[in-house]
Regions:
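Hydrophobic alpha-helical segments
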Residues: 2-207
Length: 207
């Protein structure tokens, strides 16, 4: 039986999941067995919404504070899966944030996602550059907004108006929350020093 199926059925053996050290990190992974009973449904929901069989490092470390996991992960699920943004556009924005904050883990993971959803190789190489922000339409606008917001720069009225014109009030809110969420996650990752899994190649930052 797969771990995901076991999660959904609540069918775990005693030794299925044990909290384990993560080499190079400042925190240990919290596996399902060690998650407090009142937060097991939150732990399982992360697996369900992400379609994964094992908990990714970032969420397994976040689970050192189960209530934080319960509060943070639904926001991530919404901005990743519950918005109306084009998939490639979403990844350009996330990767802009990751590069600004020098979060290699987030950059690498979303590079893979970006390729999977059909992001352009040419545009992936432009992320964070003036050329990317000069792209016509939503791409240039959204990535410029992501960079400025991550740097805590003041957002001019004409940019806010353009974002609302392109994405509507709902999309403007979703875009802002998405940038903030991935900025928060990047800072957490960098602070607790989450190592990149051996199976990933590491494309360099563009800038």
């Amino acid at each position: 039986m797969s771990l995901r199926r076991s999660v959904l059925m609540g069918n775990f053996k005693e030794d299925d999941n044990v909290t384990t050290p993560l080499e190079g990190s400042r925190l240990e992974r919290v596996e399902r067995k060690d998650c407090p009973a009142e937060h097991l449904s939150d732990y399982d929901e992360v697996l369900r919404t992400r379609g994964m069989e094992t908990m990714p490092h970032v969420f397994a470390l976040l689970a050192n504070s189960p209530a934080a996991l319960a509060a943070v992960c639904p926001v991530g699920a919404h901005v990743r899966y519950g918005t109306e943004f084009d998939d490639a556009l979403r990844e350009y924005v996330i990767m802009t944030v990751a590069q600004e904050l020098r979060c290699t883990y987030e950059w690498v993971h979303h590079y893979v996602v970006a390729k999977r959803v059909g992001a352009s190789d040419d545009l992936l190489k432009k992320i964070g550059t003036p050329a990317m922000e000069s792209e016509p339409g939503d791409i240039g606008l959204a990535t410029r907004y992501a960079r400025m917001l991550t740097r805590n720069e003041e957002i001019p009225d004409d940019m806010a108006d353009a974002l609302k014109a392109s994405f509507g009030a709902k999309g403007f809110v979703d875009m802002t929350i998405m940038i903030g969420y991935y900025g928060m996650l990047a800072r957490f990752i960098n602070t607790v020093k989450i190592p990149i899994e051996d199976t990933y190649e590491i494309p360099p930052f563009n800038v």
